[in-house]
Amino acid sequence: MANTTGEPEEVSGALSLPSASAYVKLVLLGLIMCVSLAGNAILSLLVLKERALHKAPYYFLLDLCLADGIRSAICFPFVLASVRHGSSWTFSALSCKIVAFMAVLFCFHAAFMLFCISVTRYMAIAHHRFYAKRMTLWTCAAVICMAWTLSVAMAFPPVFDVGTYKFIREEDQCIFEHRYFKANDTLGFMLMLAVLMAATHAVYGKLLLFEYRHRKMKPVQMVPAISQNWTFHGPGATGQAAANWIAGFGRGPMPPTLLGIRQNGHAASRRLLGMDEVKGEKQLGRMFYAITLLFLLLWSPYIVACYWRVFVKACAVPHRYLATAVWMSFAQAAVNPIVCFLLNKDLKKCLRTHAPCWGTGGAPAPREPYCVM
């Protein structure tokens, strides 16, 4: 169980191991903070500055980056301070509740946003016309506000001691105090997080099945043109008969209106999804699934430790495993920019545009004017 008193449970003469462990924790968390703040700031500036990135997926990505950056700037310094002072909380109890609220808020916000993103990725591939028509800036803002509202609803009840927020000495942070499920109310929060992660992967699984079933294009079926007097018309007509009649080479009555040329407004507004757009949507889907998978991998050890505390009363969680799991959950705030720049060609192109020294040959030289003789 979590010890919240801040007193060491046992005193040993070998003080070198705790000091070395604290040094490693400080170095790793400092590195995570630097990478998270720099990477999320660069990615956010690119999305805000580049008009080509003003699309629904990048608005969601911007929200994730801002949340991770704020988490690194607000929550992690308190963890550094607690590690530096020997795994103890030197601030007030109210500040502990505020920091714990922020940590849980950003965790649930990432889970809710990743679920919403998975749904939009499925809509972008399976129902592209509806997605292109309905996924506007205001729709994205509504989705983001909904994710934040649900996150606040999940993180706010423990402020009133419903699943208490306390400083956990073994984790060096203020967070949920997970105890045996008969003595605490944190089981519902952990189940909600697990359901969200499972539902997100279920949506991506459905998207994968949809792409597998539609992996082959249907052959084009040519519809023959209709003619009683050599004035070909109908769905298969090319317009050559009408062109011949207008040019003076036709005989007989004027050909009727060609359905292949004149279309009503509803049919004209409908368009097929081009191959470049398909590749772009699939690329975004792979990038967001990689972010979701890393979220699952980095948070799973800590979630297992939480369930261990809730369901296993006799045996405590090993200290090394718990410390590793906590720092893996911290690392999740720094991985999103790395994944995005590795898997998204548009982001890499924009980054090279604003930082030519990172490109292969810098900015292209202007061509000399010439004229064709």
From Swiss-Prot:
Name of the protein = Probable G-protein coupled receptor 173
Family (UniProt): Belongs to the G-protein coupled receptor 1 family.
Q: Which cysteines are joined by disulfide bonds?
A: 96-174
Keyword Disulfide bond (UniProt) = yes
Which ranges make up the Extracellular topological domains here? 1-26, 81-97, 161-188, 309-322
- Supply the alphabetized keyword list: Cell membrane, Disulfide bond, G-protein coupled receptor, Glycoprotein, Membrane, Receptor, Transducer, Transmembrane, Transmembrane helix
Q: Name one GO cellular component term.
A: plasma membrane
How would you summarize where this protein is expressed among tissues? Expressed in the ovary, specifically in granulosa cells of follicles that have passed the primary stage and in oocytes (at protein level). Expressed in preadipocytes.
Instruction: State the function annotated in the UniProt record.
Output: Is a receptor for the SMIM20 derived peptides Phoenixin-14 and Phoenixin-20. It mediates the Phoenixin-14 and Phoenixin-20 augmentation of gonadotropin-releasing hormone (GNRH) signaling in the hypothalamus and pituitary gland. In the ovary, it mediates the effects of Phoenixin-14 and Phoenixin-20 induced granulosa cell proliferation during follicular growth.
User: In which organism is this protein found?
Assistant: Mus musculus (Mouse)
In terms of SUPFAM superfamilies, this protein maps to:
Family A G protein-coupled receptor-like
| Stretches assigned to coiled coil | none
Q: Which residues lie on this side of the membrane: Cytoplasmic?
A: 48-59, 119-139, 210-287, 344-373
Transmembrane ranges, per UniProt, are 27-47, 60-80, 98-118, 140-160, 189-209, 288-308, 323-343
So which domain of life are we looking at?
A: Eukaryota
Q: What kind of membrane protein is this, topologically? A: Multi-pass membrane protein
Q: Which Pfam families match?
A: 7tm_1
Record keyword DNA repair present: no
GO MF entries: gonadotropin-releasing hormone receptor activity
Q: Where does the UniProt annotation locate this protein?
A: Cell membrane
The residues that the database entry marks as glycosylated are 3, 184
Gene3D superfamilies (UniProt xref): Rhodopsin 7-helix transmembrane proteins
